[in-house]
């Protein structure tokens, strides 16, 4: 299980951002070059442009008459990320949280700002689960999203702006935040449902003892790891999400509060799904062990039957193998054939008897 394919050759394991410092660095595994794009929209206009990371000021691009959405893709340029955070009134420690993928999920509310740090989970085309660190900074009419890679995570949110879904171009930045969170939560819902579906497929396979179950143990372990990733990313988010419903800084207005309630319901669905996955995994482990015991019992049963058939044959062979001088059977003309016939008759009789008793 890995975060993405874009893995830095040194994996930045020497960077932890665990201590107080004047400057922090990106501590993740992606090697995506930092790019910044700015989408500005209002009732009448919508346009997007690229911004250089070495700009002396990012605040100068803000249009007070529009919603300004900065998309920062790639966190390798930690200096640019820190400057953006500082310029919009946040502390260096907030930059540390953004640059540290190992940071816990949190929603931090200030007087005029809000910082959301979380992780998104999704399956790629190879059906491998990926986890990506995402942060969202919102202040007034400015929304800044930070992603580790250049994957189009928020493509659906941009399309919603283009089509003016739910009158987003007439609303404040709180509705844009709702669309961004909806994209992340939708990925978690899809991932959790996919894991549950795959676990149910494994269960159907295990219930049919005739199926080949050679790699089922490894498959269960793999699905368990995927479940743990989703649970790790969703459980803390659900606990923190209540802060958004109680916020009083004006970012989330009363007219869009039902949307956030719906997002909370989706998170609750994810929690319920992961709980279901946990129970299924527990039962699958028991079922897998039980099936292994049944297969071992079946093997021992076959070996016992074979041994039982050969016990009387061994007895007969032992008698005729004794070296007594007075054994008339040894001098019979048809003694050898009679011995073979008796052995076959004994073996067949034993087999028929066990078959009649339904022992196999």
What spans do the regions from the language model cover?
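Long amphipathic alpha-helical coiled-coil segments
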Residues: 242-257, 283-292
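Hydrophobic alpha-helical transmembrane segments and their immediately adjacent juxtamembrane loops
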Residues: 2, 7, 265-360
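Short acidic-hydrophobic sequence patches enriched in Asp/Glu that either
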Residues: 153, 255, 259, 333-337
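Peripheral, non-transmembrane regulatory/ligand-interaction domains of membrane transport proteins
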Residues: 1-246, 251-253, 262, 266-273, ...
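Short hydrophobic alpha-helix at the HAMP-DHp boundary and the N-terminal turn of the DHp
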Residues: 213, 220, 253, 260, ...
